[in-house]
């Protein structure tokens, strides 16, 4: 079997609320860390979410 191209990652809130999203990422085309601006319901505002590994 071939190695999977898409991997699951965890996008953790930079507001230190502990909230996170799970997203997919193409590891061949996106080699750098993913950063997205999304809504954090705990902080009740839009903040940056940074990539971390799923344990």
Curated annotation (Swiss-Prot):
Molecular function, one GO term: structural constituent of ribosome
One Pfam assignment: Ribosomal_L33
Domain of life per record: Bacteria
SUPFAM superfamilies xrefs: Zn-binding ribosomal proteins
Biological process annotations from GO: translation
A cellular-component GO term for this protein: cytosolic large ribosomal subunit
Keyword set, alphabetical order: Ribonucleoprotein, Ribosomal protein
HAMAP family linked: Ribosomal_bL33
Protein family membership: Belongs to the bacterial ribosomal protein bL33 family.
Protein name in UniProt: Large ribosomal subunit protein bL33
Organism: Rhodopseudomonas palustris (strain BisB18)
Encoding gene (name): rpmG
């Amino acid at each position: 079997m071939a190695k999977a191209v898409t991997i699951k990652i965890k996008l953790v809130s930079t507001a230190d609320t502990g909230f996170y999203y799970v997203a997919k990422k193409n590891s061949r085309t996106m080699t750098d860390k993913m950063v997205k601006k999304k809504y954090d319901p705990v902080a009740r505002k839009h903040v940056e979410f940074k990539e971390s590994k799923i344990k």
